[in-house]
Every structure is written in C-alpha cells, then in structure tokens.
C-alpha cells in the first residue's frame, strides 16, 4: 500500500498521458483555467503538458494526505513535490518537456548525494539508519550497502537521461513508471539476497 502511495503521482502522470487523446474537447478547453496550461484538443504534443499538470496536483495531494494521516511530512514526498513544482512548472510555462524529463534524474541524484554525505560526514550511513532495527551488520557492510545505493541512484539517473534523449517521449513515459520501478525492485531483491548471508538463524 505504501509503495502505491509513494508512486501515486507517477501513476497518475502515466495515466493522464495515455488517456489525454480520449478526453472530450470541451473538457480539454476547460483545463485552460489552470495557470500556464494551454491545451489544444487532440494535439498529441500536449499530452505531456496535461500529464505534468496532473502530476503537480497529485504531488500536492500526496503531501497533504500524508500530513493529515501522520501529522508530519515525509522527506521524500517534499523533495519530489518541490522538484515537480519547479521543473513541472517550467515545462508548463515554456511548453518544453525537457524540464519534467530531468525530474527523475534530479531526484535520484539528490538521494544519491544524501547517501554519500551521510557516509562521509556522519557516524552512520543512511542505509544503516533505515535498516539497523531490522538487521545487525558490521560497519564495513553498512558502508558497502550504502555505497551500492549511491551507485544505484547514479545509474538510475543516467538511465533516465538515456531513455529521455535516445527514445520517443512515449517510451520515456513508460520507462518512468515501469522501467524505474523494475530497476528498483531488481536492486532491492538483489540486496535482500546479499543480506541473507549475514542473517543469524534466530533472525530468519
């Protein structure tokens, strides 16, 4: 359930992009009331603009719902909201999808930078802070895991740019949801297999 909630803006972005050409013209015309959103009914190049506007609204809703339920903000949601508002807003203002295409890369690289900073400047790397209640590992292994996450975020950001510039917009939209999710799941599963060797029998 939490995974779905975290992916909520991305899922709506994908759905809005795919369904844009099926929207009735009068609904598309009515969307012009949204600031910087000027759409032409049936124009395929406008699908990314519509999807970007939906993603901005979904991110605002995500942060609001999380705060309403937990009475606090989650850092990942705030970072995503800030970037989608800035880069998504630039996409709508300049009618240029380049800005929103950079968002996944910037998000990944910011997280990678945070993991790197935690390893260089704090006593415990971020991955240890997040997982130490579930498993006990030597410091060297925590550092190795943290380094693996840094590499993962770097590679994910580069992969997003490669798909964004080497393939069509439609391919990138699919990759943004399914490709990035697939990469993350593969990495997490690989990490789980790696960690099994450090589990004590009592922890199984």
From Swiss-Prot:
It comes from the Bacteria. The chain crosses the membrane at residues 48-68, 73-93, 102-122, 147-167, 170-190. It holds the Pfam family IspA. GO terms for cellular component: plasma membrane. It is found in: Cell inner membrane. It is a multi-pass membrane protein. Keywords: Cell inner membrane, Cell membrane, Membrane, Transmembrane, Transmembrane helix. HAMAP family: YciB (MF_00189). Plays a role in cell envelope biogenesis, maintenance of cell envelope integrity and membrane homeostasis. Belongs to the YciB family. This is Inner membrane-spanning protein YciB. It comes from Nitrosococcus oceani (strain ATCC 19707 / BCRC 17464 / JCM 30415 / NCIMB 11848 / C-107).
């Amino acid at each position: 359930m939490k995974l779905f909630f975290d992916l909520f803006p991305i899922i709506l972005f994908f759905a809005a992009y795919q369904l844009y050409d099926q929207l009735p013209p009068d609904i598309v015309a009515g969307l012009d009331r949204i600031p910087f959103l000027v759409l032409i009914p049936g124009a395929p190049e406008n699908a990314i603009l519509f999807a970007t506007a939906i993603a901005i609204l979904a991110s605002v809703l995500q942060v609001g719902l999380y705060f309403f339920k937990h009475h606090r903000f989650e850092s990942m949601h705030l970072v995503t909201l800030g970037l989608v508002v800035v880069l998504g807003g630039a996409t709508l203002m300049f009618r240029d999808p380049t800005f929103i295409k950079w968002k996944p890369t910037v998000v990944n690289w910011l997280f990678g930078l945070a993991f790197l900073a935690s390893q260089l400047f704090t006593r415990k790397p971020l991955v240890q802070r997040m997982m130490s209640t579930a498993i006990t590992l030597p410091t060297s292994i925590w550092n190795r895991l943290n380094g693996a996450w840094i590499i993962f975020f770097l590679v994910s950001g580069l992969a997003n740019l490669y798909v964004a510039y080497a393939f069509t917009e439609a391919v990138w939209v699919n990759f943004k949801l399914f490709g990035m999710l697939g990469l993350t799941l593969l990495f997490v599963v690989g990490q789980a297999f790696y960690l099994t060797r450090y589990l004590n029998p009592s922890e199984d």
